[in-house]
Regions:
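Membrane-embedded alpha-helical bundles of multi-pass transporters/translocases
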Residues: 1-301
Length: 301
């Protein structure tokens, strides 16, 4: 099921790319969109993404096994509260200081004004940092309960919304001007990420997950999460720096189309991983985490 849904997601992802290419092509607007739209996910990964992906699932399963449903719900509620505080704060800073955030992706370019549109769109996109964090926790909880449908199908809904936004770009721009069209695709892209996150919430209740959102920095489960996740920080920092330099260099080599070329090419070379490895690794990591908590190391091997 996961592989099938992943294929559907990739198909809609290709359609999304075609819709984007048809709407804004290979242009400065396209590059601005790519830079601004990729940055929220990069920042989420840098601040908490790697830690959540690596550490949340085994810690959650351990708490639920050893302390019960109520304790695991408290752990989830505490983590959500911290995400709202930290990622919400970063999202607010990104909205207010958008040009500075965009500079991290264009610092090699001598033309600072070339990314004005990217900064404008990033003001719409910054809240995605929070949405990605919340969605990651929701997906982790559902995966822990072997419920892979919504976490795998959610990107399809995201793609459909973004496709509709790009399809509306030309008529809206013709009727109300290009700035209105830019607002449409910026708002539509953020709406897609919100729906991708929010559509998973109803499924949580089916598994008895009703977290009480609060903040407790003394929670032992939180400390365990941080301890397990810290080693991934180096990898996420390296990835952020590498991607930032790549985008900045691309804007020097091809000032208007560099980031767009990279984005279109990346879609193809990540395809094998997205179709096969992603779904397998998601399911296997859940089983590995379960077996490790049960100390069934023979099954892990």
């Amino acid at each position: 099921l996961m592989t099938i849904l992943t294929i559907v997601s990739r198909i809609t992802g290709f359609i999304r790319t075609w819709a984007m290419a048809a709407a804004i092509g290979m242009s400065l607007l396209s590059s601005s969109y790519q830079v601004a739209n990729n940055l929220p996910n990069m920042l989420y990964e840098l601040v908490m993404g790697g830690m959540l992906v690596t550490a949340f699932l085994p810690v959650y399963m351990g708490v639920r096994r050893e302390q019960g449903r109520e304790a695991s719900n408290e752990y989830v509620g505490n983590l959500l509260g911290i995400l709202l505080l930290v990622l919400g704060g970063i999202s607010l800073l990104g909205t207010v200081f958008a040009p500075g955030f965009i500079w991290t992706q264009s610092f090699l370019s001598g033309d600072g004004d070339s990314m004005d549109t990217a900064a404008f769109m990033f003001r719409f996109f910054a809240i995605q940092i929070l949405f990605y964090g919340l969605g990651s926790v929701f997906s982790g909880v559902l995966n822990a309960h072997r419920d892979y449908f919504w976490s795998t199908f959610a990107p399809v809904l995201n793609n459909v919304i973004v496709i509709a936004s790009f399809m509306g770009f030309a008529p809206v721009s013709a009727q109300f001007g290009e700035r209105a069209g830019i607002i449409l695709i910026a708002a539509g892209t953020t709406l897609g990420v919100f729906v991708q996150m929010a559509c998973q919430i109803p499924a949580l209740g089916k598994h008895g997950v009703h977290p009480h959102i609060h903040i407790d920095f003394k929670d032992p489960a939180l400390r365990q999460t941080i301890a397990l996740g810290i080693p991934t920080l180096l990898a996420t920092v390296c990835m952020f720096v590498s991607t930032s330099i790549t985008n900045a260099a691309a804007l020097v080599v091809q000032p208007e189309t560099g980031p767009s070329v990279i984005a279109y090419a990346r879609l193809w070379y990540t395809l094998p991983y997205a179709l096969i490895a992603a779904s397998l690794s998601t399911a296997l990591y859940t089983e590995f985490s379960h077996d490790a908590q049960e100390k069934d190391y023979d099954s892990v091997r």
